[in-house]
């Protein structure tokens, strides 16, 4: 009696394995494109602030959108400032001014001090 060819069980609806196992016509596995996000950094900060607290994937998506939005706003404002001052380079000074313009009061002060601290740490590590 001939053996029947064993086939892999059909993936469940919505299964992520179905996407990873997708094959091209020549038999090679297709690489999944990487999605860049700030999720690992958001998670690290969360653990520094609240070590026993978790975050849902929906909340992480919202945080990722928030960081992307703020990044874009700061970059646009810094670009505008550089253009006004006839500069072709965005420096930490433009970023700092953009943060002061975009964020309200106390939040701007904290952001500027944390940013200054990060730049100092970066330059001293060189």
Swiss-Prot record:
The modification N6-glutaryllysine is found at residues 17, 35, 44, 47, 109, 117, 121. The modification N-acetylproline is found at residue 2. The modification N6-lactoyllysine is found at residues 6, 12, 16-17, 21, 24, 44, 86, 109, 117, 121. Monoubiquitination at Lys-35 (H2BK34Ub) by the MSL1/MSL2 dimer is required for histone H3 'Lys-4' (H3K4me) and 'Lys-79' (H3K79me) methylation and transcription activation at specific gene loci, such as HOXA9 and MEIS1 loci. Similarly, monoubiquitination at Lys-121 (H2BK120Ub) by the RNF20/40 complex gives a specific tag for epigenetic transcriptional activation and is also prerequisite for histone H3 'Lys-4' and 'Lys-79' methylation. It also functions cooperatively with the FACT dimer to stimulate elongation by RNA polymerase II. Phosphorylated on Ser-15 (H2BS14ph) by STK4/MST1 during apoptosis; which facilitates apoptotic chromatin condensation. Also phosphorylated on Ser-15 in response to DNA double strand breaks (DSBs), and in correlation with somatic hypermutation and immunoglobulin class-switch recombination. Phosphorylation at Ser-37 (H2BS36ph) by AMPK in response to stress promotes transcription. The modification Phosphoserine is found at residues 15, 37. The modification Phosphothreonine is found at residue 116. SUPFAM superfamilies: Histone-fold (SSF47113). Glycans are attached at residue 113. There is a cross-link at residues 35, 121 (Glycyl lysine isopeptide (Lys-Gly) (interchain with G-Cter in ubiquitin)). Its main location: nucleus. The modification Dimethylated arginine is found at residue 80. It comes from the Eukaryota. Core component of nucleosome. Nucleosomes wrap and compact DNA into chromatin, limiting DNA accessibility to the cellular machineries which require DNA as a template. Histones thereby play a central role in transcription regulation, DNA repair, DNA replication and chromosomal stability. DNA accessibility is regulated via a complex set of post-translational modifications of histones, also called histone code, and nucleosome remodeling. This is Histone H2B type 2-E. It comes from Mus musculus. The gene is H2bc21.
